[in-house]
Amino acid sequence: MANYMIARFDEIDAVKCPCGFAKRAFAGPDNSAATMHIVDIHADSRAHYHKKLTEIYLVLEGSGQMELDGDKIPVTPFTAIFIKPGCRHRAVGKMRIINVCIPPFDPDDEWFD
């Protein structure tokens, strides 16, 4: 098995998520390191948190706010956000982001108040 993986986001189907729609790369049983997503946020997302997952967002297009543990932070293209486990967060506005999840995204680690 190769020591690398390649993903072509133009060949990945988008799935519904609390933030809008996501294309998730490197998700599979052979990867325990991280996943990378392109997320299209079309409306205000639902506040949530993760008990195990760390997320790194990079805003590519659009603008809005990130709500992070109650703080409202304006975001524009090329803003990066590091979200630790336990941080309640949501995106507000219309934007496209890259989301890196460490360890890989697990829908069972998505918690809502």
Residues of each region from the PLM?
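A short, N-terminal "cap"/entry segment at the start of jelly-roll beta-barrel domains
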Residues: 1-34
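Conserved short histidine dyad/triad with adjacent acidic residue
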Residues: 35-51
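A cytosolic small-molecule/anion-sensing beta-strand core signal
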Residues: 37, 60-61, 76-77, 93
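Surface-exposed loop/turn positions
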Residues: 43-45, 79, 87, 95
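Short glycine/proline-enriched turns and hinge-like loops at secondary-structure junctions
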Residues: 50-52, 93-94
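Glycine- and acidic-residue-biased ligand/ion/polar-headgroup-sensing regions
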Residues: 52-65, 69
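Short acidic-glycine-tyrosine-enriched beta hairpin
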Residues: 70-86
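Ligand-binding loop in jelly-roll beta-barrel domains
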Residues: 85-110
